[in-house]
């Protein structure tokens, strides 16, 4: 006898049922009957992530332009690279919100209250790096919580946030290395 346990349920719903369900609520696009997450909650969480990314873009841009001192050129280049990556993340998140039939909230009103990260300017190059590192660490923790919440209910949003999380972790490592390089 085969050691693999067999499930009595069919692997997929019969094709006739799949086709019929696909025609229902066609205006919802990618949000099908099989979508099991609370769409409104997911859109709210994604808008918070969007605000976080936008605040990070703004902070990194300021730090890029304000970086001064002996190590400023290499650190500013890192700030610029991170700002560009955060902008890509913002665009990806906004695209997913639209795919879920939501509206991405780009309004400056309340941007800081929606964002998990703060907008801190920093007085010196080291302060700027530390503020960016704190913001990355906040994003890492909040995105991990979002990923846990999404679980299998919204695997597409979960994978998006997992990909973004990996970049945020790399950014945190970059910033720690910059601090070590400056101290050396």
Q: Model-predicted segments: where are they?
A:
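Iron-associated oxidoreductase/ferritin-like identity signal
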Residues: 1-184
């Amino acid at each position: 006898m085969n050691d693999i346990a067999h499930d009595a349920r069919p692997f997929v719903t019969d094709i006739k049922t799949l086709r019929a369900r696909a025609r229902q609520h066609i205006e919802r696009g990618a949000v099908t009957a099989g979508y099991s997450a609370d769409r409104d909650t997911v859109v709210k969480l994604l808008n918070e992530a969007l605000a976080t990314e936008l605040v990070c873009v703004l902070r990194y841009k300021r730090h890029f332009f304000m970086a001064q001192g002996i190590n400023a050129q290499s650190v500013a280049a890192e700030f610029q690279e991170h700002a560009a990556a955060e902008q890509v993340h913002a665009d990806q998140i906004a695209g997913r919100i639209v795919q879920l039939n939501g509206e991405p909230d780009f309004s400056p009103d309340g941007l800081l209250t929606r964002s998990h990260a703060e907008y801190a300017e920093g007085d010196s190059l080291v302060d700027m790096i530390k503020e960016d590192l704190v913001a990355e660490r906040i994003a890492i923790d909040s995105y991990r919580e979002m990923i846990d919440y999404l679980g299998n209910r919204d695997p597409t949003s979960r994978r998006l946030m997992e990909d973004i999380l990996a970049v945020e972790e790399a950014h945190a490592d970059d910033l720690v290395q910059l601090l070590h390089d400056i101290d050396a």
